[in-house]
Amino acid sequence: MTEEKNEILKEIKRSFRSMMNGVASHSMREKGVEYKINWGVNLVNLRMLASKYDKDFELAIALWKENIRECKILATMLMPADKMDAEIADIWMEQVVSQEMAEMLALNLLQYVDYAPEIAYKWMASDKPLYQLCGFCIIGRLFSNGQEPNERGINEYVD
C-alpha cells in the first residue's frame, strides 16, 4: 500500500473517535459482536465519511484487514464492485462474524457484482446461517431491482 493510502487509512481511523457512540458499542459487545475495536459509529455517519472518498480497491482491502467494525463497513462502501472478484468475496465472507456485517457486505457491495446471482444461490444453499443471510439479502436486492432468476435460480430460491 502506498504511503498516501496509509495516511488516508490513519485519517479514517482517527475520525472514528469524534463519531463514537459508547452506548451502542457496549450494547453490541454485550450481544456478542466482537471486534478488536468497535466505536459504535452509526451507519449515517459512516456513509457520510465514505462519501468523502472515491471507490478504491487498495484502501478497501486495507480497511477490511483491520479488525475494526467501522473499517470493515467502510470497506464494503469503498470497494469498487467491478474489482471485487469472487475469490475476495469468499475470503471476506469467511471473515464475517455478525449479522450486521453480512447485511453490509450484501447491501453495500455484493448486490452490484456481476456474479451476484451465483453467490446468492450458492450461499442460500449453505448450512452456515451468516452465508444464508447474506445470500438472501443479495437475492432480495436483485429482485427489488427488477432482476428475474433463471430456472436454476427459481429452483434454488424455492428450495
Language-model features: locations:
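Alpha-helical scaffold domains
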Residues: M1-D159
